[in-house]
Design a protein with these regions (language model features):
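Conserved C-terminal active-site "lid" loop/helix of NAD(P)H-dependent oxidoreductases
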Residues: 190, 249-284
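NAD(P)H-binding glycine-rich loop region in Rossmannoid oxidoreductase-like domains
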Residues: 44-80, 84, 88-90, 105
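Active-site Tyr-X1-5-Lys
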Residues: 119-146
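Mid/C-terminal beta-alpha module of Rossmann-like enzyme folds, strongest
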Residues: 199-259, 294-297, 303-310
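Conserved Rossmann-fold NAD(P)-dependent oxidoreductase catalytic core, especially the SDR/UDP-sugar
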Residues: 84-123, 146
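Glycine-rich Rossmann NAD(P)(H)-binding loop
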Residues: 155, 177-183, 210-218, 228-232, ...
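N-terminal Rossmann NAD(P)H-binding glycine-rich loop of SDR-like oxidoreductase domains
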Residues: 3-23
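Substrate-positioning beta->alpha
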Residues: 158-164, 178-201, 207-208
Length: 310
């Protein structure tokens, strides 16, 4: 069986592709740049042809929130690119798995279900939602598609907005928390998402749109306190009053702080998911999300100079 993985140089694919190959699948990695697991170099915003037969396509390639590229670049990759990959899936009659994002919901009340109203905030969420709508168009014409709305994906090797927190932990500096820190903020261990993608190979769920938000976590205060202990740091949590959120959003817009307006709209609220539909597929989470953050902190400390650039 042949599986095409787009975004083969990306974070999720780096864990997914070796597992697929170990299980005996023929894997075609596709990315716009060369990489360890990339066999086809191609800009997915352009028409795509693959000579090989393809049974499953796992579409991971996307411009991400923290890349802060132009709206046009977001649309070219996340919307036009998704349609090009769907065209390929249609020509191969391949089962298509689209990894979308829980950011399509905006910042609603928790727990969030698949019936929660969609309200995408920002170019990333909007373009991923548009990608979902294109998937539905192909699904209506008979293509087998599963849409996974994933929460933030964390694990060893990824730092993103957390590298500032990790540096503060290393320097025994304050850990800033927006609001009182009693809110629960959900995220996904990368290995859980990888295992679910592999699970879908034997347990196809065409027509399913499902949230994949990770186990319901502890509060932000509890999570950061665990990291302080794990990192043997003398850092302390400092709470930032919500009255200053307007200033933080301005600083984010000016790219002075390493977060986006969407991050600021959710990080002080409960943001977690009802897992009933996911569990009905037969899959259960296998990894503790806090361990993903601990792995990231370990990675940061072991690769400090390199990590600063990631």
């Amino acid at each position: 069986m042949t599986i095409l993985v787009t975004g083969s140089s990306g974070f999720v694919a780096q864990s997914l592709i070796p597992k697929l190959e170990k299980l005996g699948f023929d894997v075609i990695g596709l990315d716009w740049k060369n990489g360890k697991h990339t066999k086809v170099i191609h800009n997915i915003a352009k028409p795509l042809e693959i000579d090989d037969d393809v049974d499953i396509i796992i579409h991971l390639a996307a411009r991400l929130e923290h890349e802060r590229c132009s709206k046009e670049e977001f649309f070219k990759t996340n919307v036009d690119g998704t349609e090009q990959v769907l065209n390929l899936a249609n020509s191969k009659n391949a089962y298509f798995i689209y990894v979308s994002t829980t950011a399509v919901y905006g910042s609603p009340e928790s727990p969030i279900t698949e019936n929660t109203s969609v309200d995408p905030n920002g170019a990333y969420a909007l373009t991923k939602w548009n990608g979902e709508k294109i998937c539905k168009k192909y699904e209506d014409s008979g293509l087998e598609i599963t849409i996974i709305r994933s929460g933030p994906i964390l694990g060893q090797g990824r730092l993103g907005i957390y590298k500032t927190i990790f540096k503060n932990l290393q320097d025994n500096s304050i850990i800033p928390v927006l609001g009182n820190g009693d809110n629960k903020l959900s995220f996904v261990h990368v290995e859980d998402l990888v295992d679910f993608l592999i699970y879908l190979e034997k347990n196809k769920k065409p027509g399913l749109t499902v949230n994949f938000g990770g186990k319901i976590p502890g509060s932000i205060n509890q999570i950061f306190q665990e990291l302080i202990i794990h990192g043997q740091s003398k850092s302390r949590i400092t709470h930032i009053p919500l009255q200053l959120i307007w200033l933080l959003k301005l600083l984010a817009k000016l790219k002075i702080i390493p977060v986006t307006s969407w991050h600021l709209s959710v990080m002080h609220k409960d943001n977690y998911y009802d897992n009933e539909l996911l569990f009905s597929t037969g899959y259960v989470y296998r990894y503790e999300p806090i361990n993903a953050l601990k792995e990231m902190l370990n990675y940061f400390k072991q690769n400090n100079k390199t990590a600063e650039k990631n």
